[in-house]
Amino acid sequence: MAEERLQKVLAAAGVASRRASEALIAAGRVRVDGRRATIGQVVDPAKAKIEVDGLPIGNASRTTYLLLHKPAGVTSTTQDRHADTTVLDLVPTALVPDHARLYPVGRLDQDSEGLLILTNDGGWSEKVLHPRFGVEREYALAIRTPLSYDQVEALERGVELEEGVATLQHLRAMTDIEVERLEDLLYPPVPVGLSWYRATLRQGWKRQLRRVFGAVEAPIERLVRVRIGPVRIDGLKSGKVRPLKAPEVRGLGGGGGRSRGDNRIEDVVEVLPESTARPRVRPSPRRDTSRPGGPTRPPRSIRPARPRPPEIVDGD
C-alpha cells in the first residue's frame, strides 16, 4: 500500500477529522511504531503500527456508514464516563468492522432524538458537515400551542443569537397523518395536544432550534431530526440502526438534499382536504368544552390570525 500523510490515515480510520487529527499529532497523542509522530509524517497504513492514546487505530480497509434513530436520553458522544448510554451502545456488533472506531457525524442534544449518522470515514463526514456543501437538516418539533402571526414574523426576520442571526430555511405545520406516522416511530409516547411543525436548517449551531423557539416564547417540548440531506427517517424506529445505502452515501458526500424554492418561511395550510383527512384520535388542547362538541377545528396554518399571502409551494 502506498504511503500517505498520517492525518489522512487517521481520518480514514475514523479517529477524527484531518484537522483534528493534526491537533492530536501536535499534542503528542499519536505514535507510529512506538515513536512520537510528527506533523506531515507519511506512513504505510498496511505496515505501520499507529496508536492514539496508546490504543491501535481501526482497520481503514472498510468504511462503514450507519444511520441511527437516536432516542432521547442517549448521549451522542462515543465515550462519556458520566453517561448511562451512548450511541455506540445501540449499534449491533455485526454492523461494526473489526476494531473500527465509529463516531457521529455532528451531534444531537441528549434531550433530542432522531437521525444520527455514524461512520469511520473522516473525509466524507467533513463534507457532510461543511457549510459549503449546504446539507440540510430537517426537524419535527412539538410546542404546546400553535404559533401566532407575530411569532412567525419574528422567525422570518431571524433571531439574534451569540453566533449571529439564526434563520430557518423552511417552516410549516405538519398534517395529522404526518404526525401519526412519526409518533409510531417514537419512544416514549408523545403527550396529547401538542402542535407539530417541520423546520429546516443549514446552520448547525448548538441547540439552535431550542434557542430560536425559546426566544419567541414557544419552547420546544419534543425535537426529532427527520432528515439529513436526502436521507429520511421513513420507518426507522427509535433505537434502531440500518446501514446507509450507496446512493445515500453519494448524495450526502456530494452535498445533496437541498430543497427547491426560496428561503422564506412558508405559510402552509393542511395538505389534505377536510373530507379525506383522517381525524385526530386525541382532542385538541384548545377545544371549547363549554358547549356540546365545541367549535370545529380550523384548518392548520402557521398564520392563523391575519389574512395570508398566496401560498408558496415547497420543493420537498
Where are these regions (language model features)?
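Basic, flexible Lys/Arg- and Gly-enriched helix-loop patches that mediate nucleic-acid binding at interfaces
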Residues: 1-316
